Amino acid sequence: MASDNIKSVEVINNPGARYDASVKAVIRITTKKAKGEGFGFNNRLVGFKHRFGESLYDQFNFNYREGGFDLTGMLSGGHYDNSQGAITTVDVHSANHWRVKNDMSKQKNINHILSGTLSMNYQFNPDHVMGVRYKLSRDPKIRIDGTALAEAFMDGTMYEQSDARYDIGGQFTSHDINAYYNGKVNDWSIDLNLDGMWHKTKQNQFTAQTITETSRKTMEENMTTFNRTRNNLLASKLVISRPLWDGSLSFGGEYSHNSRTNLYHNDEGVLDSDDSEIKEGMTSGFVEYGRSFGKLGVQAGVRYEHVGFDYYDRGKHIDEQSKTYDDVFPSLALSLPIGKVQTQLVYGTDISRPSYSDLRSNITYVNRYLYETGDPYLLPTRSRNLTFASSYQWLNLVLGYQHIMNDISQLCDPFPGKDPSVSLYKYANIDDYDKAFASLTLAPKVGIWQPQLTLSVQKQWYTAETPDGKAEFNRPLGSFQWQNTLQFSKTFNIGVNASFQTKGHSGNTHLDKTSGALSFSAYKSFFKGRFIAQLFAYDLLQTNRQYLTMYNGGRTVKWEIKPNRSVRLTLRYVFNQAKSKYKGTGAGQSQKARM
């Protein structure tokens, strides 16, 4: 979506019961009124250069409108280099102190992508509109290759080292379709969405490594794996609303059924093969009512979700890994102006279900010392939230408190076997904890200068397992973002933005050092907006280097993520371009995100 088609953007911190319980906020974008009939198009060319590689992307959008008929489409393709370096250090505190340093900073991640979308929309009259949209995405080439140097120390003395060369290749294909009807009959408004999705991913990995012991004795070790996943989803969503008792009543439901198959094989037989399938059906219903009592605005709702999760191993139903969930999510929002100050108090509950990748049982090989897996026994994360928001002219304040249950975090466990230097990364539910947060945003306008400063802080009350026993991870985590735009004219502006992150705790992780970034942007349009050039440079001083430590009992993992300075240039040409009238919002969105 191009910025010049946008009229306003609103962030809704209380989406209400009509949205899936995993939705914590909604961004509502209001577009400008559609232009006249005929054919139009725009083409966007994006070049991207960063420290580790280059990317090039082109997107062509077209539209045709005649009467109530609206046809829009998009074709895109590109070469993406998403390479980024990281160094990890695993400390194992057992009978001996083991330290394993993994340097994976020399890695290339290349994607070739193709995508196409076609939407058809017909407005019969102001009260009835329907449409259908199809999207094809294809990544014919996914390539990750590089070297991983690992060094193992026992009680401070070099034990052995491993030099691995890995090559991962794959493809991705997806088909997505949406059909919708949006209508009004007397006082009744109807919004119906029907969705289907079919995804397939294939991946081959080959790793060849040389292991050198302190005696200088060497040995070769190879690992070959194949992984294929398929995701299928059918979903529907119906929302009905009407005025009632000087307010607005909404109710409806959503249904989705999806299946995911995972096939994993290791040629050498070192790792167990996996042939599993997940089938999940979700049924939900909601009712929501809002009205004003004088100056007091009230919105109350409740949502019910039923999820049936079935896990199969080689076609056999596994009872202990199959689950049924029944959850009720109430929500209440009160809004009241006090003089010129707008205030809002919101209570709500939400849920975050684990991704299907996190639920996998197969073990993935990284190198001699590192393996990775999921956990089919993972429970959803739930939270109860209380939020207060206040705004006055260009000042906005948000205060909140959360009680978080069964949060999901990545832990570092010993790999099954006798070698304590080998670790297994896995996802697990951690203990319940509370968290408070606050943010203050100042956005005045001083002539051509439009600054926006956001100050945020969060503090948790969490007890973590460390090598020295239990420890309170309660150190606050602060950040600020300072955006500055100089609007010289309607056709030209520049921006200078800065961000900063403090040390602090988040879950079972400690951010060990401060980090920040300085960025620059420029926008210029020519020929009455037909040609647009945008330049964006991120992390100019290369200061966004991140250091963090993850704790899990007797094991700690230190991460060092290198800075990644980047420059992006976007060139866009527009001819009689009009925004699409397509009003389909989709169904089963939370399930799609988990895939």
Name what the model sees in each region.
Residues 45-49, 66, 77-81, 136-140, ...:
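Transmembrane beta-strands of outer-membrane beta-barrel pores
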Residues 115-139, 165-314, 337, 341-342, ...:
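Face-selective signature of the C-terminal outer-membrane beta-barrel domain
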Residues 526-595:
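C-terminal beta-signal and adjacent terminal beta-strands/loops
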Residues 31-44, 85, 89, 102, ...:
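Surface-exposed extracellular loop regions of Gram-negative outer-membrane beta-barrel proteins
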Residues 277-280, 320-323, 351-405, 423-436, ...:
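Outer-membrane beta-barrel signature, preferentially recognizing the C-terminal barrel domain
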Residues 1, 11, 21-45, 56-58:
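N-terminal periplasmic accessory domains that precede
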Residues 233-237, 282-284, 379, 385, ...:
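Outer membrane beta-barrel strand-and-loop segments of large Gram-negative receptors
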Residues 53-85, 97-145, 173-175, 183, ...:
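Transmembrane beta-barrel wall of Gram-negative outer-membrane proteins
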